[in-house]
From Swiss-Prot:
<dbReference type="GO" id="GO:0009423">
    <property type="term" value="P:chorismate biosynthetic process"/>
</dbReference>
<feature type="binding site">
    <location>
        <position position="123"/>
    </location>
    <ligand>
        <name>phosphoenolpyruvate</name>
    </ligand>
</feature>
<dbReference type="InterPro" id="IPR023193">
    <property type="entry name" value="EPSP_synthase_CS"/>
</dbReference>
<feature type="binding site">
    <location>
        <position position="95"/>
    </location>
    <ligand>
        <name>phosphoenolpyruvate</name>
    </ligand>
</feature>
<comment type="function">
    <text>Catalyzes the transfer of the enolpyruvyl moiety of phosphoenolpyruvate (PEP) to the 5-hydroxyl of shikimate-3-phosphate (S3P) to produce enolpyruvyl shikimate-3-phosphate and inorganic phosphate.</text>
</comment>
<feature type="binding site">
    <location>
        <position position="171"/>
    </location>
    <ligand>
        <name>phosphoenolpyruvate</name>
    </ligand>
</feature>
<feature type="binding site">
    <location>
        <position position="169"/>
    </location>
    <ligand>
        <name>3-phosphoshikimate</name>
    </ligand>
</feature>
<dbReference type="GO" id="GO:0009073">
    <property type="term" value="P:aromatic amino acid family biosynthetic process"/>
</dbReference>
<feature type="binding site">
    <location>
        <position position="24"/>
    </location>
    <ligand>
        <name>3-phosphoshikimate</name>
    </ligand>
</feature>
<comment type="subunit">
    <text>Monomer.</text>
</comment>
<feature type="binding site">
    <location>
        <position position="23"/>
    </location>
    <ligand>
        <name>3-phosphoshikimate</name>
    </ligand>
</feature>
<keyword id="KW-0057">Aromatic amino acid biosynthesis</keyword>
<protein>
    <recommendedName>
        <fullName>3-phosphoshikimate 1-carboxyvinyltransferase</fullName>
        <ecNumber>2.5.1.19</ecNumber>
    </recommendedName>
</protein>
<keyword id="KW-0963">Cytoplasm</keyword>
<feature type="binding site">
    <location>
        <position position="388"/>
    </location>
    <ligand>
        <name>phosphoenolpyruvate</name>
    </ligand>
</feature>
<feature type="binding site">
    <location>
        <position position="28"/>
    </location>
    <ligand>
        <name>3-phosphoshikimate</name>
    </ligand>
</feature>
<keyword id="KW-0808">Transferase</keyword>
Length: 430
C-alpha cells in the first residue's frame, strides 16, 4: 500500500495564506441559487469535492450551472423549476449535500434515491427522516438509524411543523427550513444550542423571510426566492489548521487573509485566545463578517471546552486536540458526542492517531482529556477517509523530530481543501 510521506521537523512557518472558500456557505449558495428565480452568481466558491457533489446533484435535477470568469453562474427557475432526475443522486462524502438537498426535495412532486460513499453510508439520517416524515414526506434509509441510501418521495402539500431539535445540528435545522419554504403555514424550529446560522442568513439574503428569536426560528411558507450575487469568504474551518500550526511551531508568523468570522463559527478564536494565543485581527469588516488574522507562536495553556461553545467549533475540535497536546496542563473537551458521527468517529480516531505519535489523550463518551505538552514521534497513520483528520495529521507531523509520518488515503483532503499540501510547502521556509 502506497502511503504519503508527510513533511516532518519543520522550521518556523512564515507567509500569507488565502484559505479556500467557506464550505458551508458554498453549499448553501448553490442550493438556494438553484431554486431562486433568475441568475445567481457566486464568487470565491470552494471547489472541493463536497461542493462539486452538490453542484452535480442540481445539474441532475435539471438546473443549468456553469463557470464563467471564475464565477459560478446558476440559472434558477424557482422551486417549480426542478425536474425528476433520470438517475440516482450521488452525494459522495458530503453529509451536508444529502441532508440539505433531502430537505429541499421534500416539497417536490417526484421521487429520488440518494446515495453516498462508504463513509457517508455510515452516517445516520434518522435526524432528518423523522421531521421530514412529520411534514408529509415519504422518506426512508437502512435500519432504524436510517443510513443511506435514502429513498424520498416528495409532497407538494407539505405540512408545517414545530420541531425541537434533539441534537445540536445546523444540517437538520437547515433541512427543515428548506422544506418549510415550500410548506403552507408556520414552521418553527427550536434549537438545543445555537448552531451555525448560514442557512437563515442566506435565505434572507435571497429575499426570504424568517424570524430568529434566540434558539427559536419561525418561517411562514410558501415563499419564493430571488437570485443574488454572492461572495464566499474564506473558510474558518480550513484557516484553523494554519492558525494552530502558527501557534505551536516555534518562530512562526502567519497572515490568514479574508477569513469568514460569522459569530456562530468563531468558537475556535475564543478558545485559542483563552489558551494564550497571540493573534491580531486586521482589516476587520464587521458587516461582511470577514477579517485577516495574524498569528505568531505562543505559549499555550490547557482549558475546558464544553456546552454552547461546542456547536461553534465542532469541525475544529480535531486540530484543537492537537493544539492541546502542545499546551501546558490539561485540556478537557466535553459535550461533543456529535464528533462520533462525523466522517469518522473523530473522538476515537483523533485519540488513536495522536496517541500513536506519543500524545497523552483519553477518549471519553462525549470528548477527550488531553495532557500536555508532549513530544510527538513518527507513526504510520491514515485519514480513514476524513479530510479534517488528514490535515490535523499533516500539521502534527511538522512537530516530529524523530521518525517519519506516513499517511494513507490522503486524497480525502480534496473534500474541503484541494490546495492544502501546496500551501503547506509554501509556508515551510527551510
Amino acid at each position: 500500500m502506497k502511503r504519503m510521506k508527510l513533511r516532518t521537523n519543520a522550521g518556523p512557518l512564515q507567509g500569507t495564506i488565502q484559505v479556500p472558500g467557506d464550505k458551508s456557505i458554498s453549499h448553501r449558495a448553490v442550493i438556494l441559487g438553484a431554486v431562486a428565480k433568475g441568475e445567481t452568481r457566486v464568487k470565491g466558491l470552494l471547489k472541493g469535492e463536497d461542493v462539486l457533489s452538490t453542484i452535480q446533484a442540481f445539474r441532475n435535477l435539471g438546473v443549468r450551472i456553469e463557470e464563467k470568469d471564475d464565477q459560478l453562474v446558476i440559472e434558477g427557475q424557482g422551486f417549480q423549476g426542478l425536474n425528476a432526475p433520470c438517475q440516482t443522486l450521488n452525494m459522495g462524502n458530503s453529509g451536508t449535500s444529502m441532508r440539505l438537498i433531502a430537505g429541499l426535495l421534500a416539497g417536490q412532486p417526484f421521487s429520488v434515491k440518494m446515495i453516498g460513499d462508504e463513509s457517508l453510508s455510515k452516517r445516520p439520517m434518522d435526524r432528518i427522516v423523522y421531521p421530514l416524515k412529520q411534514m408529509g414526506v415519504e422518506i426512508s434509509g437502512e435500519t432504524d438509524r436510517q443510513f443511506p441510501p435514502l429513498q424520498l418521495q416528495g409532497n407538494r402539500n407539505l405540512q408545517p411543523i414545530t420541531y425541537t431539535l434533539p441534537i445540536s445540528s445546523a444540517q437538520v435545522k437547515s433541512a427543515i427550513l428548506l422544506a418549510a419554504l415550500q410548506a403552507k403555514g408556520t414552521t418553527q424550529v427550536v434549537e438545543k444550542e445555537i448552531t451555525r446560522n448560514h442557512t437563515e442568513e442566506m435565505i434572507q439574503q435571497f429575499g426570504g423571510r424568517l424570524i430568529v428569536d434566540g434558539k427559536r426560528i419561525t418561517l411562514v411558507g410558501p415563499q419564493q426566492l430571488t437570485a443574488q450575487e454572492i461572495t464566499v469568504p474564506g473558510d474558518i474551518s480550513s484557516a484553523a489548521f494554519w492558525l494552530v500550526a502558527g501557534l505551536i511551531i516555534p518562530g512562526s508568523e502567519l497572515l490568514l487573509k479574508n477569513v469568514g468570522v460569522n459569530p456562530t463559527r468563531t468558537g475556535i478564536l475564543e478558545v485559542v485566545e483563552k489558551m494564550g494565543a497571540q493573534i491580531v485581527y486586521e482589516d476587520m469588516n464587521k458587516k461582511e463578517q470577514v477579517t485577516s488574522i495574524r498569528v505568531v507562536y505562543s505559549n499555550m495553556k490547557g482549558t475546558i471546552i464544553s456546552g454552547g461553545l461546542i456547536p461553534r467549533l465542532i469541525d475544529e475540535l480535531p486540530i484543537i486536540a492537537l493544539l492541546a497536546t502542545q499546551a501546558q496542563g490539561t485540556t478537557c473537551i466535553k459535550d461533543a458526542q456529535e464528533l462520533r458521527v462525523k466522517e469518522t468517529d473523530r473522538i476515537q480516531v483523533v485519540t488513536d492517531i495522536l496517541n500513536s505519535m506519543g500524545a497523552n489523550i483519553k477518549a471519553t463518551a462525549d470528548g477527550m482529556i488531553i495532557k500536555g505538552p508532549t513530544v510527538l514521534y513518527g507513526a504510520n497513520t491514515s485519514t480513514y477517509g476524513d479530510h479534517r483528520i488528514g490535515m490535523m495529521t499533516a500539521i502534527a507531523a511538522l512537530l516530529v523530530k524523530q521518525g517519519q509520518v506516513h499517511l494513507d488515503k490522503e486524497e480525502a483532503i480534496m473534500t474541503s481543501y484541494p490546495t492544502f499540501f501546496k500551501d503547506l510547502e509554501r509556508l515551510c521556509h527551510d
